[in-house]
Structures are given as C-alpha cells and as structure tokens.
Amino acid sequence: MIRKYQKSNVVIIGFGKTGLSCLNFFLIRGVIPKIIDTRQYPSEMKNLPSFVEYCFGRLNDFWILNANLIVVSPGVRLDHPIIIEAMKLGIEVVGDIELFVREISAPIIAITGSNGKSTVTQLVSKMAKQAGWSVGVAGNIGVPVLSLLKKQYELYVLEISSFQLDVTYSLRATAATILNISVDHMDRYPKGLEEYICSKKRIYHNSYFCVVNDSDPLTKPLLNDGIYHVSFSMNSKSADYRLEYYKGNNWIVANGEYVLSCAELKINNCMNYMNMLSALALSDIVKIPRIVSLQVLRFFSGLSHRFQLVYKNRNVCWINDSKATNVGATKEAINNTIITLRDGNLHLLLGGDGKLANFFELSCLIKHYAIHLYCFGKDGVCLTQSGFNDVFLSNNIIDAMYIISRRVQRKDIVLLSPACASLDQFSSFRARGNLFTYLAQRLG
C-alpha cells in the first residue's frame, strides 16, 4: 500500500545516512519534515537543504509532541521519556524499513540475527544476481533501504537489525530468518535477553516462510508465525538443510539430497557452513535455480572484516574479525581459530564498547585454551577484570599491536575479534579492521 503523507506533520530524529534518506523520501512526496539530532554536528548536516527546519544538539520536545509521524533512525533510543510520551499520545513512531515496505509489492527476503547477517545477505543477493534477477540489497549493511525506491526490482534482500525491527509493523516477507541469537545490545534492552529476542522475532510476523536455525532454540518462531517453517542446522539430522558426513567429506544436504561437497568450498569453517545452509534455504524458497546458488557457494571467499586472513609472514597468521561486535561472534571466531592452531599460541585483541555485555562465557573459553589477551578501548579495564588470565591492557589498538609484535612467535595466530562495538575510538568496525590490517602488515 502506497501511503500519502501530504498532510502529515513529520519529524525525523537522527540525521546520519538513514535520516538523510528519510528526508529525501518525504521531500519527493511534497512533505517538508523537521529534523532533530542530539549531536551538535550530525554526519549529514552538509546535505541539509536550507529550507528544512532543524534542531541539533538536543531533542525538541515541542516538535516531537506535536508531530503525527515520527521517523527514528536505528541509533535513537525508544526508551527516552519524550519518545515514550509521544507513543502514549498515539503518535506514530516508525523507522525507514516501515516506510519502505509500505511502498513495494515485490518479494522480500528478510534476514536478521546476532551474527552472520551481512554474509547471508551477500550470498543470497549474489545467487539472485547470478540467476539474472534484478535485486535490491539494503538495510543494516550500510545502504539505506529507501534508496532502493529509485527503481523497481524483482526481489529485495534486506538485512534488518533489532533496532529497525522495533519500529517496523508492516513487513510481510516471502522468507524471513533469524540466523542465531546471542547476548548483544544489552545497553538498549534494559529488560535483558528476552526483550532482545522479542525484537528479533518481529521479523517472522506475517511472513510466508520462516527459515529457522534448528540448532538455536532461541530463534524458534511462535506457532502462529509464518505459514511454512523450513529448518537448517549443522548437527540436526531432521533439519531440511543440514551438514552430513558422506563418502569421506562433509556435504550440504538439501531436503534429503546431497547437493554439494564441502571439499569444493573456498572457505571451510563452521561459521560459513551455517551461513551457506541458511542462504541456500532462502534462495530455494524464492526459486532461484539451485545450480546457480551452488556455484555461488563454491566460489564464495567471505566478507572483509569477517574472519579474514589479512597477512601471513614467518608462519604467523593475522586475522581480521573486526565485525565481531558481540560475545557470540567472538566465541565462534575463537573456536574456528583453535581448530587450525597447531603448535602455536593465539593472541586475541578484545575491546571497544562492550554494550553492557557479560563476558563470563568468553573468559571461560579463553582460560580453557590459555589464550594471550590484549584489551583496549572504552571497556578495556572492565575486560581485564572479567576473570581472564594473561591480560595486557592498552589505551588503544596501536599500543596493543606493538606489544603483540614483540611477543609473537612462529606458528602463532593474531586474531582481532573484539566482542565490542567500535564507535568509542573508530568511525566504524571497518575503520578498526583497516587499522589492524595496516599494523599487521607493518609490524608482522
């Protein structure tokens, strides 16, 4: 349903990439919103037209309470008292995904999860493009979803965060999946993990197919979510898409058929097996030719900043996993590293903004494998007090890397998998990963 907004009094809160895309969305429809950002100098202020009213450096309570539509960017907290008051008054509060899904009718594949979202989004979109389809890819991967409205596509593949799902109500995905759930964003969900899970499960509402991780009970949809359920798993023999050992190799099995030997893959680790199983399930649902999908899996070499080998010298491997911004992602990275580690030691860089996460699980794993730990950033001190052994504390990643360079020996692995957000010291996880890569090549 295409909504008419001409008589709406619209306020946009947050003026980064998403906020700018929302502004352009309304200007094209003849509506001039008001712009609010608590930052004094929002990142997109240079692109603000002179005729648009704005309030920077604080929230404007009067504007908010007199709006009839409030559009919030993902970084805006919904538990702010003035936002809560607006919702109590019946003022509509939505995000960019909600605006988008009201405008389009083509099939949507919707992907969320604590880890692996970007990888699965890229896999499915590559499968569709290789099949000759026109595909719109956007969401939490850095491309504002509203930018896709400039042209029509046959299929939309959306990576959606929990923050975006909190203010999305009209999503009706052809296929929706929660890849996995681990503790994350506890600074935004004060009621704890259950509140975070409820946010994630909003992706299933009104979907046609729910693609479910059989290995993670936290991802299971409610009985009334979705018309059909399709499952994937590495260890469940009842899953529709699974991994099985067959003729001397692990194989990807789809609905009982052995479709691809893992020996043919460029990347062989547990993280990518799960991503590939879910991507194949999603692509099969929208009827992308399987022969095309399997070819994409064969040649997929991974994403930048996601468990990426960026340098190897003197038999020392330097792995950039800067995209690991929560405990679950770092646990996966450690487990995958330990499998390949022979006689050397693992040096782990951990730190940034921990988002009030509990690092106890991580400390047990690190102590079990006698990992050398280097903490840095906003929560570096907190991390050193989380029960870890053999810990070095640095102000920043540069100092930590210099310490590592003096300690590292042949056959060692250096892993940046911070379990924390990057915004305390970097503009993004990409900037953090790029600095690690530069330092590895210089110091290694």
Swiss-Prot record:
Enzymatic reactions: UDP-N-acetyl-alpha-D-muramoyl-L-alanine + D-glutamate + ATP = UDP-N-acetyl-alpha-D-muramoyl-L-alanyl-D-glutamate + ADP + phosphate + H(+)
GO MF entry, a single one: UDP-N-acetylmuramoylalanine-D-glutamate ligase activity
InterPro entries for this protein: Mur-like_cat_sf, Mur_ligase_C_dom_sf, Mur_ligase_cen, MurD
Pathway: Cell wall biogenesis; peptidoglycan biosynthesis
E.C. no: 6.3.2.9
Positions of ATP binding: 113-119
UniProt cross-references to Gene3D superfamilies, sorted A to Z: Mur ligase, C-terminal domain, Mur-like, catalytic domain, NAD(P)-binding Rossmann-like Domain
Any Pfam family the entry gives: MurD-like_N
GO cellular component, one term: cytoplasm
Superkingdom of this protein's organism: Bacteria
Known function: Cell wall formation. Catalyzes the addition of glutamate to the nucleotide precursor UDP-N-acetylmuramoyl-L-alanine (UMA).
The name this protein goes by in its record: UDP-N-acetylmuramoylalanine--D-glutamate ligase
Taxonomy of the source species: Bacteria, Pseudomonadati, Pseudomonadota, Gammaproteobacteria, Enterobacterales
